[in-house]
Amino acid sequence: MQLTEFNRFLKGLLQTALLAGLLSLSACETAPPVQEMSDARQAIAVAKEAGAADKAAFHLKAAEDYLESAEKALNDHEYSEARYDAKQAKAKALDALKASETSND
């Protein structure tokens, strides 16, 4: 009988330790999205050089808004959100680039 209680105690202790470990892992912040931020800035710069400010202003504005949001999230140490917004900024900048190149045809 005592062995069974001890086994239950060990099982509970193990479950608690496992849960604590999982919680600590989920609380860890990811690394800052340095590369994603750089990619977004470069894509916006290329789109501007291609004339997106005149030819694809809607897409360029969306890219700049996402980049601004990413910068705020980065400053707030919300790295997952910053990474997402930076990737969106790059995608919108590439849309602006494509739209500005299409309008040249």
Region spans (language model):
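Bacterial N-terminal signal peptides that target proteins for export
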Residues: 2-17
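C-terminal motif of bacterial Sec signal peptides marking the signal peptidase cleavage site
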Residues: 24-27
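Amphipathic, heptad-repeat alpha-helical segments
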Residues: 29-60, 67
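Helix-capping and short linker residues that terminate individual alpha-solenoid repeat units
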Residues: 48, 52, 75, 94-95, ...
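Charged, low-complexity interaction regions
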Residues: 52, 79-82
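Short, charge-rich amphipathic alpha-helical segments embedded
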Residues: 79-80, 90-105
